């Protein structure tokens, strides 16, 4: 069991949900985002954005690794900073774009393969 923080653009809510389910069903503790403002049209203030960014770095601090939700290889500037931070802290880093998780992962895996 590992503690894994999901990192990536908030416009990829569905991919975050897939990654969260996949990694959780492997027996991991998954820490995700609080808001998906880009995919839900939710607006936050600059001060709130700064708070959420700082909290995300603390999430990385308590994690064993990060899982980057980089749909089609997209990595924005905030996610790039999170990756660099995780590297500096010696955290393992995995990427969604490596194909470990497909959109039908929960339908194709047998229960005994999940753990």
Where are these regions (language model features)?
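Conserved catalytic or regulatory cores that recognize and/or transform ribose-phosphate-containing ligands
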Residues: 1-115
């Amino acid at each position: 069991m590992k503690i894994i923080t999901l990192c990536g653009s908030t416009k990829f809510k569905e991919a975050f949900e897939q990654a969260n389910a996949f990694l959780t069903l492997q027996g991991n503790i998954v820490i995700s985002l609080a808001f998906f403002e880009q995919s839900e049209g939710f607006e936050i203030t600059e001060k709130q954005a700064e708070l959420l960014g700082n909290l995300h770095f603390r999430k990385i601090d308590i994690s064993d690794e990060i899982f980057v939700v980089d749909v089609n290889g997209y990595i924005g500037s905030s996610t790039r900073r999170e990756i660099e931070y995780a590297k500096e802290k010696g955290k393992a880093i995995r990427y969604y774009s490596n194909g470990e998780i497909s959109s039908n992962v929960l339908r194709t895996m047998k229960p005994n393969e999940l753990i």
